[in-house]
């Protein structure tokens, strides 16, 4: 996929974060203002009419997949000024992109004629005489468009990332849209922004280019569970015994985080985002015993799937695809 993209420059942005949108703590602004009865995303969902979908994209044709991790909001901090080791900085360089790079990539794939499609439109589960299995569907696309799936690994906002120039969580603002919470590493000012995080950036890009989405499709969050999801610490701590004096306070905090993330999940689903598993513990599936995989899968379903809903999508951590049929 990378060969399809234009060069994205170095690991800096012109302002290193100075162009962020600073708002009140509830995320109020004037973007996408609508009345109480109209969802602005309706215009995206309905942009392509059925009679415009004249190009068949068959099962033998490639559907490109472009994946990201959370993007770096403050590259100067991440690559030069934070306390990360050199190896950690190399890791950021290998696996992450900056806000500036991300914006250029979105513009590049859009300019090349790609359109976002939903994974469930590409594949279907069928049961026939040979059993239950997945089959590729034929997509109907606008003439001249090519299908693209975008996914984001580890949108959990792990604590280590908060010290390395990333945003910290997703929230729903007063405008009903998704914002990111961010703390400026130089001033310690905490604010909401739509300009420094991959999720609201893609949201805004699709609002501005509704032809970039087929039937309102957006992207997939590939989530672990061991440090919560979407910036909320929803994970259980099984090291705290049921009769521990620390248990009531932990359970109360976890319950508050679970309630806080629910409206975020709801709005993401309403606006074309879907969810997949990256395993609960980010484990290598090709090296773990089957029972470990079963236990991990059950814990993901209990702590993550119970919030985002069931999924048929699994993203292999470390590209560790297991062999065999288990």
Tell me the role of every PLM-derived stretch:
Residues 4-7:
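C-terminal motif of bacterial Sec signal peptides marking the signal peptidase cleavage site
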